[in-house]
Amino acid sequence: MHKAIYGFIVSLVFTSALSFSDAGVADEEVDYSLESAYFSTIASGHLEAVRKAPGVVSVITAADIASMGATHLDEVLETVPGLHVLRSDLSRLEPVYSIRGLQSGFNPQVLILFNGVEFKTPFSEGTPPMFRLPLNMIERIEVIKGASSALYGANAYSGVINIISKRVGDYIPAIVQVKNGSFHSRDITTQHREANDEGAGFFFSIEHQTSAGDSKRIVDQDLQTIIDQQSGTRSSLAAGDLNTDYSVTSMLLNVENDVWSWNNWFWENKGAGTGQGVARALDNDGYVDSSSYMSHLQYKQIIDFERAIESNLTYHYLDSKNYFKLFPSGSLIPIGNDGNPFTPINNPVLFEDGVIGAPEYNAHKVIADVTYQYIGFEDQIWRSQFGFQYTSFETSERKNYGPGVLDGTVSPINGDLTDVTGLPYVFLEDQKRRNVFFAVQNQWYFHPDWTLTVGGRWDRYSEFGSIFNPRLGLVWEPRHDFTGKLLYGEAFRAPSFSELYMKNNPSGIGSASLLPERIKTYEIVADYQVAPSLRLINSVYFYKAEDLIENKLVGSVYQFQNAAQQEGYGLEIEAQWVLSSQLKLKGQYSYQHSENTDTGEVIADVPNHTGYLSIDYKMLNDWALHLNNHWIGSSARERTDTRNTLSGYAWSTLKVSKAFEQHNLETAVIVKNLFDENARTPSSPIIPGDYPLEGRSIWAEITYSF
C-alpha cells in the first residue's frame, strides 16, 4: 500500500512544482474552454453541451486517449468516475465493467455501442468473447451512467458506453504507428483518409496487436489442485501462469457524403488464451477464436428548419470457435451417469488427454430503426423512434464428456471428440429472438433557466413479452457557470440465451421462465464551472435493482433464477483544471456502497473507494509528459469466503513523447504499472491468491504522419 501512497505523492508534488514554475502563465487568461471540447449525443440523442445534458456523461476524446499512453479500451474506461474494470472469475479473465457496484461475470449490465449500434453477443448479452479493442480508430468515447433503457432499450442498465470511430468528416492525417513492448507485445496501425471539397470520401484504418502475455502472473493453486489432493493424482498445472496471450485485428472502412454514411468494422481475436481456464483449472492448450463483423448504413437529413430524420440499417455477425481443456491430461474426474463432471451418482474416470470441450456458435443480427426529430413547437425538441431487431443463433459442439458421450462406467477416456451438433446433447440449441420497439422523448425549455426532459421506450420481446421504461430529467441553469440536475430513470436487462436455454452443463442450466432484471435510478448532479479553466462535477445517486439473475442450486442442479435484489448509493466527484496552456490536471474520486437487500450482505469484489489523478504537461521543444495514477480501494469478500479482504492498489502510467514536426514524426516511451505494484483482481476461493495483474511493462512508440 505504500506504493499507492507514493504514486499519489509523486503526482501531487510534480503538479505543485509545475504550477509554481508556470505561475506567470497560469495567471494569464487561458484561451481554453473545457465546455467547448465536451459535447455529446449520448444523453438525449442530439448534440448538446455535456453539462446541460439530462444525464451524467463522461467524454474521452482521441487527444485524451493519445496523451495517456493507453493501448486498449479497458485502460481508457478506468478513468471514468464510478467505473472500475475487473477481470471475470467466470469467463477467462474477460473484462467486467463494474459501474456503481453493478456487475456480473459476463458483463451484461452495461450496453456497449459502436457508433450508436450495440454489438453484444446474444449468448451472454456481454461483449464478444475475449474482447480487447485497440484505440487508434476511435475519435471519442461517450459514457452515461445510470438507467438508460428509455433511449437504448435492453441492457442499458448500469450505463452505456458509445465508442465513436473516426470518419471522413474528421481531420485525420494518414499515419503509420508501431509500438513494441514488454511480454513480446507489438501494436501496428495504419490509417488513411481521402475526401473531396464536398466532404465525400472514405477513411480506412487497420490495427493489429499481439502479445504473449506476462508469464509472471502466477497462480499457486487451481481447481485441479484440489482434485489432485482428493484423488492422489498430480495433474494440475499450478503453480503456473495465466494464459493471457492475444492476437487482435481491428479494421474499419467508413464511406460517406453529406447525408449517407456506410461503416464497416471487422474485429478478431485469434488464438486468445483462456486465462485461468474455463473450469478454473489452468489450461495451456485451450484457445478462443472470436470475430465480429458489423456493416452499418445510415441516412441523416435535415428536412427543413423544423424537421430532421435519421434511419439506420445494421447487419452484425458474431463467430466464436473454442477449444477448452477443462481439466488437464491425466486428471481423474468423478463423472455422473449423465456424463458430466461432479453430478450425482458418479464414478472416477481417468482422462488421459484431459477433459475437452470445443463449443462453437455464430449469431446473425439485423437492426433497423427510424428516428424523427421535430422542433416546430416553441421551446421544445420532440424525438420519436421506431425499430426492430432480429437475432438468429446457431451452435455446434464436440467434446469427450457429457450426455450422449459418457455414462461414467468407462475409464480411461482419450482425447477423441464426439460431435453432438444438432443432437439433444448440445450445450444450447439454435435460437431466434425478435424485438420491436418504440420510443418518444420531449425536451421542454419551459423557462430560461429550466429544461424538462420526459421520455420512455416500449419494447416487445418474443420470449418474455412487453416492457416499458420511462425517464425524467430536470436541468437547472441559474447562471452561465452552474448547472444542477435531478434525474430519474428505469431500465431492464434481457436474459441471455445461455440463461434461458443452456443445458447439459454441470455449471448451470437455463430457465425459460426468467424475467428481465429491472432497476430504478435517482440522481442529483451539480456541475460548476468555477473559472474558464476549472470545472467541478459532483453527483449523488441511489438505485434499486430487482429480479437479478443468479446461478442457484435447485435440488442437485445449478439453474439460473431471478433470485436477488440489490440497492446501492454513492458519490462521484470530478475536477478538470487547465492551469495553463501547457499544463492540465484531471482528477476524480468515487464512493459506492451496494448490498443485497435480501440478505443485507455487502456486494463482494467491488471496491468502495476509487480515485484517479492525471497530469498533462507540454514542455519546451515539443516534449510532452503524461502521468496518471489509479487508486483502487479494498474489496469485501462473499460471506462464505474466509479469506481476508482484498487489498487495494495504485496503478501508475507514465508517457514521455517528443515530436519532430519538420519530419512529421513523433516518438514516445510508455511505462505501465510504473512502480511494479503487486495488483490483484478478485478470484473465487478455488484460486485463493486472487488473479495478479500485469507487472511493469515498457513500450516504445513511433508515429509517422503524411
Protein language model features and the residues they cover:
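Short, acidic, small-residue-rich periplasmic hinge/interaction motif at the N-terminus
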Residues: 24-66, 74
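Periplasmic-side early beta-strands and strand-to-turn transitions of outer-membrane beta-barrels
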Residues: 150, 162, 170-171, 179, ...
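Outer-membrane beta-barrel signature, preferentially recognizing the C-terminal barrel domain
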Residues: 288-302, 427-433, 490-545, 552-578, ...
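Gram-negative outer-membrane beta-barrel transporters
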Residues: 445-451, 540-544, 562-639, 675, ...
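Short acidic/polar hinge/loop motifs at secondary-structure boundaries
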Residues: 117-145
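Face-selective signature of the C-terminal outer-membrane beta-barrel domain
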Residues: 254-269, 291-464, 475, 534-540, ...
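Conserved C-terminal beta-signal and adjacent last beta-strands/turns
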Residues: 193, 249-251, 269, 288, ...
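Extracytoplasmic beta-strand/coil segments of soluble accessory domains associated
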Residues: 31, 42, 74, 78-117, ...
